[in-house]
Every structure is written in structure tokens, then in C-alpha cells.
A protein has these predicted regions:
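C-terminal helical subdomain
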Residues: 178, 185-186, 197-236
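Conserved Rossmann-fold cofactor-binding substructure of NAD(P)-dependent oxidoreductases
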Residues: 65-82
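Conserved N-terminal Rossmann-fold NAD(P)-binding element of oxidoreductases
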Residues: 12-16
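Rossmann-fold cofactor-recognition segment
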Residues: 53-70
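Conserved glycine-rich Rossmann-like NAD(P)H-binding loop of the short-chain dehydrogenase/reductase
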Residues: 32-48
Length: 236
């Protein structure tokens, strides 16, 4: 059984924690002693309430659909008086893996790109001022978002959405040149989740604790980094 650390007084705003990697991140940071505000899209889809029982007083659950700007604005208003040592956005959907850019419908392409690229960056724009100069701003990307590493093709729409996210985050960092905060694009590896599938080589338990350790080790390192869960730099 994992040891649960006492409260450290540090705070995380985790956007997208209803299941999979996001849920595991919420659990890991609670175990590390952080106070966590975690968001879900629908209360009926989340197991987070169970974590709230296990970590009494250190988990708050908010509901938001980040693809709806009005809901993002409302959440920002609810949290206006708060500060967070770490803002981390975890959002991801994919289309049929076999669809090429020639096959995908416009509506499906828009759904994936809005969820995976536009909406996470809107959240970062809305909430970044709640992160102090010593804090960290991070977003879950994918190794498939690397243009340099795209030798095999496949997953065309998903790759494009994560590459777009990486580019938008890089533009955000350029616009905030001189910002002392750490900024991170985190690639968790291919993990066995509902989205990753049963054939993925990594378990959630093999990825997320190491990813959290990597994120925490970057505190105080200004500028943007694109890292995998082990802390290795991913080529752009």
C-alpha cells in the first residue's frame, strides 16, 4: 500500500481528472500531500468522489467543459481568490486511429483539434495569472505531437492536434519571455487507459508517478520544456 504524505500546503489546479491519466494525477498528488482542485465534465462520469473520501479536506471537485468558453469563464470567477503552485491541463480525445486526413470529416477534425489544442490553451490563458512566479504551468501532450519524430505516420488527426497544442504553448511561452515560471509540455508515454488501449506498454502506475516527479523537479526552471514522463527532452 502506498504511503500517504502529510499535507505540504502546496496546491494543484488539475483540469480534466475524471478518468485515466487525469484521475491518476489527482490521486498521485493527493498521496504526495498536495491540496488538489480537480475538474470533471460530468459528475456521473467520475470516480473522484471516492478519492475525496480517502483524502478528506484536500480534494475539491469542480465541473467544467473546457470546450465551452462560458464554463471556463465561470470556473475562473469561482476560483478568482485562489493561487496554485501548479496549473496542469489534461485534455484529450482521438478519432478512429485508422482515419487519414483524407477520411476524417470536418466535424470530427474540429472536435479533436478544439478539445486537444484550442481548449487547453484557453484554460491556460484564463488561469495563468493564478500561478505565482515560483509556480509551474503544464499541459498533457503526447510524444505523437513531435513533428521531428513522426517517421511512421498513422494517428494523423491526433498527431496534428497535439502538434498544434505544442506550437500554441510555444507561442504562449514566447509571448511571456522572461516569465520566471516553469512551463511544461508533458508526454506521458503510451499508457493503458480507455484512450490508450489494452495494447499500450505502460500501466498508469508506471507512468504517472514518474511524470509527477518530473513535473515537480522542474519548479523554478524558467521557460518551456517538452519532456516525457522520465524527464527526457522530446524533439519538437
Amino acid at each position: 500500500m502506498s504511503v500517504i504524505a502529510p499535507s505540504l500546503g502546496k496546491s494543484l489546479l488539475l483540469i480534466g481528472a475524471s478518468r485515466g491519466l487525469g484521475f491518476a494525477m489527482a490521486e498521485e498528488y493527493l498521496r504526495l500531500g498536495w491540496n488538489v482542485v480537480a475538474t470533471i465534465r460530468s459528475e456521473s462520469q467520475s470516480k473522484l468522489a471516492g478519492l475525496g473520501q480517502a483524502f478528506k479536506g484536500r480534494l475539491e471537485i469542480e465541473t467544467v467543459d473546457i470546450t465551452l468558453p462560458s464554463e471556463v469563464t465561470a470556473l475562473r470567477a469561482r476560483l478568482a481568490s485562489r493561487t496554485f503552485d501548479l496549473l496542469f491541463v489534461n485534455a484529450g480525445v482521438k478519432n478512429d486511429d485508422r482515419e487519414t486526413i483524407a477520411d476524417v470529416s470536418t466535424d470530427e477534425f474540429v472536435r479533436v483539434i478544439v478539445t486537444n489544442a484550442l481548449s487547453p490553451m484557453r484554460v491556460i490563458e484564463a488561469f495563468q495569472d493564478l500561478v505565482p512566479p515560483t509556480g509551474t504551468i503544464g499541459v498533457m501532450t503526447s510524444g505523437l505531437g513531435s513533428v521531428a519524430n513522426n517517421q511512421a505516420g498513422s494517428y494523423e488527426v491526433y498527431r496534428a492536434s497535439k502538434a498544434a497544442l505544442n506550437t500554441l504553448m510555444r507561442s504562449f511561452a514566447a509571448r511571456h519571455a522572461g516569465d520566471p515560471r516553469a512551463m511544461l509540455l508533458m508526454a506521458p508515454g503510451w499508457v493503458r487507459t480507455d484512450m490508450g488501449g489494452v495494447q499500450a506498454p505502460l500501466s498508469v502506475e508506471e507512468s504517472i508517478p514518474k511524470l509527477a516527479s518530473t513535473v515537480n523537479a522542474q519548479q523554478g526552471k524558467a521557460g518551456l520544456q517538452y519532456l516525457d514522463y522520465l524527464g527526457r527532452t522530446v524533439p519538437w
